[in-house]
């Protein structure tokens, strides 16, 4: 009797899903002094993300919705692929990785005025970089400076 109970418990444990890692999430926003079309257009140049997302070393287009990337989160290079799962021109871009280090995110664009745009970045990840929220704030600050410098030159 005890043998069959133990065997059933073992079988049930083997069929049970593995414990899922914790999901870390962060959200930040910034107001960029530029029209929404210009702001969206800059972010949608996916290969240029390393210009303001400093942990990214390289992004290369595979096809219209898939990109390979190399990033340097904590002193070591990691590679992966991400997929653009939603793109609403002028409004929103959402993505998720399809590699081992799960990460998903969405960046949204809202006009504040004809010459100002609010950019909101939300990220969810099983990877726990130190101060995820602070990193998003840094990336958005870099993006703001990049866009506003280009806007000032025009």
Model-assigned labels for residue ranges:
Residues 2-64, 146:
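Hydrophobic ligand-binding cavity/cleft-lining segments
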Residues 74-78, 127-128:
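Short, cysteine-centered beta-strand-loop-beta hairpins and adjacent loop/turn segments enriched
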Residues 61-68, 87-95:
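Short, hydrophobic/aromatic-rich segments at coil-to-beta transitions
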Residues 55, 80-82:
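Short beta-alpha junctions and helix-cap segments that line functional grooves
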Residues 3-7, 19, 83-86, 92-154:
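Beta-strand/loop substructures that line and gate deep hydrophobic ligand-binding cavities in soluble
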Residues 29-33, 60, 70, 83-85, ...:
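Generic structural detector for well-ordered beta-strands
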